[in-house]
Amino acid sequence: MKKRVLALTMALTMAFLTACSGGGGQSGTAADTGGGESGGASAETGGNSAVDAEITEPVTIKFANYAVLEAGYDVYWNGLLEKFHEENPNITVELVTAPYGEIVNTIINMAGGGDKVDVIFGEKDWIPTLVDAGLAAPVENVLSQELVADIYPNILEACSMDGVAYGVPMYISPFLMYYNKDLFEQAGLDPNSPPTTYDEMLEIAPKLAALTTEDGNQVYPFGLTTASVAVSGACLTSSVYNFGGTVLDEEGNLAIDQGFRDAVEMWKTLDDNGYNPQNSKLKDLRNLFALGQLAMYYDQSWGYNGISSINPDAESFIASAAPLKGGDGTGESVLQAGTLMVVDNGDAQKAAVAKLVDFIMSEEMLTEYFETVSPAYPARQSMADLEVIADSPILAGAADSVSNLKTVTFVPALSDLNLELCTLAQAVTVSGTDVDTAIADFETAARGILE
C-alpha cells in the first residue's frame, strides 16, 4: 500500500507542476558554448545514438562536483566513477572540486581562463547563473533523446529558461520538515503527531526549549537556515511560500506581499524566543539535529545523509513531515533537485558526457544512491515505482508535500537574490532590525540586482 501511495503522490506532483513551471521569467542569453571538431566519437550526440556511440580514441572530460569532498557522498561518487571507467576505458573523468559555496565561482573562473568543465553536479538554482555565464548548454544538444524524454516533462521545464532545458535532475525533493521523535517524547509530545502549522509549532516550542541534552547542551525547537549561501535563500523562499507569499512574480519582478511579510515576522519571532540557531547553514542544522540539539528543521530529503554520517543511529529517531502552513498559506514548498548540467565542448566531449550522465542516471546507480547515500524522489518516469523509494520510512511522513509545490521563476541573478534574502533574515535576527525597515532595505537591494 505504501508503494502505491508514494507512486500516486509522485504522479500528483507532476500534474501539479504542469500548472506552475519554473521555466518562465526573465532569462540570461545562453552564449555559444560549442566548438571543436569530433576527436574520437563515431556517432553524434543529442540523439539515442549518443550513449551507444563507440569512443574509439581516449578522451578526457572534466566533472565539477562539490559532493566528492563531503563525507557520506565521497564513497558513492568515487565508486561510481571507478565503475564507469571500467565500462568505458577510453574515457577519463577528471574531477574538479571545491567546497559547496565555492564551486560555481570556481567553474566560472576556470572558464574565464579558457578551461571549461564538461559536466556539473549541483543545485537546480545554479542554472540561471551558468546560462548567463555562457556555460550551461541545452541538454538536448548533448544528452541522449531517450534520457531527456524520460525526465518528467514538468521537472524538465523547471530546469528551463525560455523553454530550453539546461539540466536533468538526478533526484528531486521539496523542502520538508525533519523532526526528532525522541525529543518529542521527552517533551511529553506525541512523536507521531508533528505540528502542521507555524502556530502549532510555536505552541509546543516552549516544551522542547526546556530540554537539554545529557551533557547539558541547549535544545533548539525549530531550525531554519539563514546563513549567507544561496541554498539558504532557497529555503527562505520556501518559508515565504508556506505563508502563501511571493518573492518574484511570473515575469521575474519583485512581488512583496502579506505572505512575505508574515514569513519575515516568523523568522524574527523564532529568533526573539531563541528557538532557531542564528546564522546557521544547513550543515550546521544537520549537525545539531544529529546530536539531539534540534527538535525540528527544514531540509532537502538528502540532508538525511549528513545527519546519518554524524550519527549512524539517527534512523531510530528521525521522521519527516510536510512543511508547516502559515498565515493564509497552504504550506507550499520549493522544489529542489540534485541536477546535472552540461557544457558543449565539442563532439568528442559531448559523446563522453552523454555516456557519463546516462550511467549516473541509470537505475542501478540511482538505486545505490537512494539505498546507501540518501532518500529522494527520482526524476525519471521509468523509475516511478522504485521499491527503495516506495518503502522509505524517511520519506513517508512528507510524501504529501511533493504535491504541494510552487516553482521559482528563474532569473539570471537568482543566486544573488537568494543571498539578499539571507541578508534580510540576518537583519531581523542577528542585527535586530525591525521588520518594515529590513524589508524596505531588501526591496532596494533586490531591485538593484534584478534591474
Regions of interest found by a model, annotated:
Residues 128-135, 155-193, 224-249, 329, ...:
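Periplasmic solute-binding protein
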Residues 40-54, 99, 122-176, 202, ...:
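Hinge/lid segment of periplasmic solute-binding proteins
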Residues 111-122, 135-136, 291-299:
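Alpha-to-beta junction loops
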Residues 204-207, 250-279:
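Glycine-centered hinge/linker elements that transmit conformational signals in sensory
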Residues 6, 20-129, 148, 191, ...:
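Conserved N-terminal structural module of periplasmic/extracytoplasmic solute-binding proteins
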Residues 59, 82, 86-87, 92, ...:
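Extracytoplasmic/periplasmic substrate-recognition and gating elements
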Residues 97-106, 125, 196-202, 277-291:
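Short helix-initiation/N-cap motifs at beta->coil->alpha
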Residues 158, 321-322, 370-423, 427:
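Long, aromatic- and glycine/proline-rich binding clefts that accommodate carbohydrate-like moieties
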